[in-house]
Amino acid sequence: MKKRTLLLFIVVFAFNQSSIYAQNTDVFSPKYIKETMVKVTDWQMKNQIHKETDWTNGAFFAGVFAAYETTKSPRIMDSLMAMGERNLWLPHPRFDHADDIAISQTYIDLYRIKKDRRMIQATIDSVLKMRKIKGNEEKKHGIAWWWCDALFMAPPTLAKLAVTLKDPSFFVQNDSLYKQCYDLLYNKEEHLFARDAKYLWNVQGEGKKEANGKKLFWSRGNGWVMGGLVKLLKEMPKNYPTRSFYVTLYKEMAARLLSLQQADGLWRASLLDPASYPGGEGSGSGFDCYAMAWGINNGILNKATYLPAVQKTWKALNSLITPAGKVGWVQPIGADPRRNFNSESFEVYGAGAFLLAGSEVIKLKK
């Protein structure tokens, strides 16, 4: 008990120390948001720790492109183009693994500006190959998108291809793969996703549990889904036949996540047992902020209900950033809640989540 009390004190003290940076700043001013997005982009660009086409950077560069759209910084555009050229505009090598086309979201966004087909051809080839050949993921797991993170990594790429190429078959392909993942992992009582089949309970009520006996639902995993839903819905035509399915899912999850937000504005690594995981987590909270702000901006979420929550989260997220631009309190790569991060913990996807959030928060009307 003493150890746990000491841990909680250390977490709260460290959080308060890092909060000093944002306490006396208007974090909602467009000038501040743009400057902070550039600062976060610059710091993370200089502190890369993964291959640029890795899924981690797929999430980061999605945020960097959002930073470009927000700031119109030529330097950010130059950095994005240089990244694509260095990697020959190739996705990661596994054609049937959702992670490996996460980077393609950014390739397609850049293609829409530059109109150079070679920027997206390898992505098109990879996605079409899935229609012809059963890949290793489906052979091993029964479905290709067998973990909830996949719903951020791949659906936006398929949706962007559908719109860019004016080919709805990519939406159809997404619908099939998405529904398989949804049917396997979505809990219709909790309105949350299990990370993968290992975290499902059987009919006898047996399975992985938190210390309080509740089911294990991972904050970042559900943040991935929310962020992916937004990026999918941004592309999908209003009259697309299955759009209502995605909107309903988005609203269900938004309402549930709103009820699980903690007093400081952040979500804990474990959604249903926050007391066991002191200290807010930056990446899941960033994706949730992005998703809810977008919903307000597009009239899908009730402003009176969700705006206070988004404002609270945005303030809290800014308290996680060092003066140099590092986004701290980000849980390392994993698949479930852990107590393995602190103010010094960063990951590229944490920066990406913050940048995506900033791109929508700046559009909010108070």
For the regions a protein language model found, what residue spans apply to each?
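Bacterial Sec-dependent N-terminal signal peptides
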Residues: 1-24
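CBM-like carbohydrate-recognition segments
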Residues: 23-58, 66-86, 90-104, 110-129, ...
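Acidic-glycine-rich active-site phosphate/pyrophosphate-binding loop
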Residues: 32-37, 78-80, 125, 129-136, ...
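Surface loop/turn signatures of beta-propeller and other carbohydrate-active proteins
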Residues: 36, 86, 90, 136, ...
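The tetratricopeptide repeat
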Residues: 60-63, 103-106, 150, 154-157
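Short, well-structured alpha-helical patches and their helix-loop capping segments
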Residues: 115, 122, 142-153, 166-173, ...
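Asp-box/WD-like beta-propeller blade repeats and closely related beta-sheet repeat scaffolds
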Residues: 120-158
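Extended ligand-binding clefts on enzyme/binding-domain cores
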Residues: 148-149, 159-271, 278-289, 301-330, ...
